[in-house]
Amino acid sequence: LLTSAGDKRSYYYHVPENYYGSWNYIPKDLVIACWWYDMREKSLAHFSGLGYRTIGASYYDGDDLENIKGWLETLGKTPGASGIIYTTWLAKYDLLPGFGDLVAKAERPKL
């Protein structure tokens, strides 16, 4: 688990310290998957600004595709963003065709 500079938590669950600066130890050839929807703009900008390629890890277990639309909009404006992955905790696949359609039509960022 990495955190971006915009995440000011002083701890993470049972970890006695924070993760601030953890990105300084990650090789630049790794792709960072940002999954926290509310922090997507800050996280993507942070890791992109450090030279990492990024992808969005959208939450798909909702009842509509609004979450995905927000991710695609932000990814389209993020240099170094190279895609989006489908993540589900509930094995919910009924919106998968619509997800694919949105991704196929999305604006592509410059790599």
Task: List each model region and its residues.
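Substrate-binding groove of N-acetylhexosamine-processing glycoside hydrolases
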Residues: 1-111
